[in-house]
């Protein structure tokens, strides 16, 4: 078993001479884009176009066009609000159940409880970590009104299975696409961009996302014009026009400054994704070179492109992940765990959710062993070589 005490930080003193490695390098990205970002900020300041306005409208249309979504995009305050807006627009509320994967960020299930419905946790696929369609079916009940499909880490869940299943049972399919914006599903039955394959889709522009703002932001997307209009109304206090409120909504508007900054990044979208894919390919090659036999690399879904929001490996069973992380940190190599605790084990849901009868053993196993390596647009081959070499050294000593 790996023992952190057998690897003192002094062994890695030479690492301080290397270029720093960041888990996410927003500083490097923004330095490259700084002139364009500054110009966008100056324009918004000069126009005082802070709430909604032309920059938001422009960004919504450009996102729709650039990613060939073929629908309607409504900006909002953040990715969590986007999920809540989608559920509210669909009329999900008390007495309803919403199936969610047990392995995700808390907002996926949090918004279900917020609208008064019951989250029902289903298990995940052991290879892709996406919602397992068979477990989703076992979680279904007469009260099931929606399923929240999370496209995790940069690729799509099994939409060839999930979309027809949801349609067969009259279940709304909401895509939580915070991590996989730009991914495309091309199955024999279902084809299209992530976020536009179900009833509604959502995304997040949190700064570390592949398309990140310099603050919070999110969006809801759908092919249904009426649903889009309701989302826009709900996000603006339920108002159809100023001081005329058709329903009780709340305040969740994408602001003009963030929209202008997102427009800058959208101009560089293809390059940003190409850099992530190149970094993932380098990790693949490096892991092949050192002949890891017990480390599981990220699986690629058969019919999905991958935008690599994260590059997550599975450590061997029994590995002391905490010790591995600490020793890597001492060597100047950051890592992260997405996610350490399945949602069904979170105290927040102790009384407000239920879990599929067969449990979620895969989600619990993955949560114990998953490890995210640095992944961003500024990664170099030298950085990645250090990451893999040090990881191999540590695991080889166990």
Region annotations inferred by a language model:
Residues 3, 13, 27, 56-62, ...:
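PLP-dependent aminotransferase class I/II
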């Amino acid at each position: 078993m790996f023992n952190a005490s057998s690897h003192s930080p002094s062994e890695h003193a030479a690492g301080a001479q290397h270029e720093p490695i960041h888990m996410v390098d927003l500083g490097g990205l923004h330095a490259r884009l700084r002139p364009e970002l500054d110009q966008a900020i100056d324009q918004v300041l000069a126009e005082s176009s802070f709430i909604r306005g032309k920059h938001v409208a422009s960004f919504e249309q450009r996102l729709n066009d650039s990613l060939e979504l073929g629908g309607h995009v409504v900006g909002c305050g953040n990715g969590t609000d986007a999920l809540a807006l989608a559920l509210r627009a669909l009329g999900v509320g008390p007495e309803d159940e919403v199936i969610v994967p047990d392995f995700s960020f808390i907002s996926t299930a949090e918004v279900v409880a917020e609208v008064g419905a019951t989250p029902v946790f289903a298990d995940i696929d052991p290879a892709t970590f996406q919602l397992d369609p068979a477990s989703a079916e076992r979680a279904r009940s007469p009260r099931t009104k929606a399923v929240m499909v999370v496209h995790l880490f940069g690729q799509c869940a099994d939409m060839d299975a999930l979309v027809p299943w949801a349609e067969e049972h009259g279940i709304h399919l909401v895509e939580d696409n915070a991590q996989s914006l730009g991914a495309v599903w091309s199955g024999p039955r279902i084809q299209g961009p992530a976020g536009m394959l179900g009833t509604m889709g959502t995304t997040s522009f949190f700064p570390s996302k592949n398309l990140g703002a310099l603050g919070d932001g999110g969006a809801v997307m759908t092919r249904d014009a009426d649903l889009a209009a309701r989302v826009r109304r709900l996000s603006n206090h339920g108002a159809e026009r100023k001081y005329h409120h058709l329903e009780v909504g709340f305040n969740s508007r994408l602001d003009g400054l963030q929209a202008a900054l997102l427009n800058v990044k959208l101009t560089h979208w293809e390059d940003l994704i190409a850099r992530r894919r190149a970094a993932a390919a380098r990790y693949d090659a490096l892991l092949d070179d050192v002949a890891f036999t017990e480390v599981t690399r990220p699986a690629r879904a058969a019919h999905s492109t991958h935008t690599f929001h994260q590059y997550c490996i599975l450590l061997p069973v029994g590995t002391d992940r905490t010790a591995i992380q600490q020793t890597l940190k001492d060597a100047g190599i950051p890592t992260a765990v997405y996610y350490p605790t399945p949602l069904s084990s979170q105290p927040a849901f102790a009384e407000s959710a239920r879990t599929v009868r067969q449990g979620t053993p895969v989600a619990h196993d993955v949560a114990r062993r998953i490890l995210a390596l640095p992944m961003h647009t500024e990664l170099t081959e030298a950085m990645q070589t250090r990451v893999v070499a040090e990881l191999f050294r540590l695991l080889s000593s166990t």
